[in-house]
Amino acid sequence: MLPARTEFQYPGTTMLQQLVPAEMLLVKLLRIWRLARTGRVPEAAWISALRAWDLPDTLDYHFDMLCHAVVTGNRRPLAVCGLGCCQIAEDEGRLLRVMAMLQHHRQAEAATALDAWLFPPAARRAESHMQALALGMSLAELVIPLMPMQLLTRGGWTPTHGQTLIRLAASPLRH
C-alpha cells in the first residue's frame, strides 16, 4: 500500500496522452460540461460522452452535481483547459486526485483534499457525488491510479472508447 499523499498534485506539464482512460474520460467530461454551461455546445454533449462508456445513467446526475459544486464552491477561479488542449489544468488534476483517493478507499485523504480545494459546504456536496461517481467508474473497471502515469492494466479500455475520445477531441466541440 502506498503512503498517504494528500499533498500530491498532477504536474502542470501532464499531457492528456499520459493519462489512463479513466483519467482522460473525467478530464474531457469536465471540459465538455463547462462548454455546455457557457452555451457553446449542447447540454446533451457531455451526457452523450459519458453514456458512450456504458456507465449507469445515474452517473449523469452525480457528475452534473459534482461539477456544480466545484464551480460554485471553488476557492479560486476554476482552472479547466479548453477541449482541444493537450495538457491538464490545475483543477482537472485536483478532480483526478480526489477521485483516485475515493476509488482506492482513502476517504479521509479525499476529504482533506476537497477541503483545501473547495469551501466547506461545496466540499461536502462534491464528496457525496464523487463517491457515487467513483463507485460507478470502479464497477466499470475505469480506475484512476493513485499516482499519475502509474503502470496499470488498462481495464475497461476498448477501441470503441478510444474512438469516442478521438471523435470528441476532433469534433467541432473543440471551438
Regions from the PLM with identified roles:
Residues 1-175:
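Polar/charged low-complexity regulatory segments
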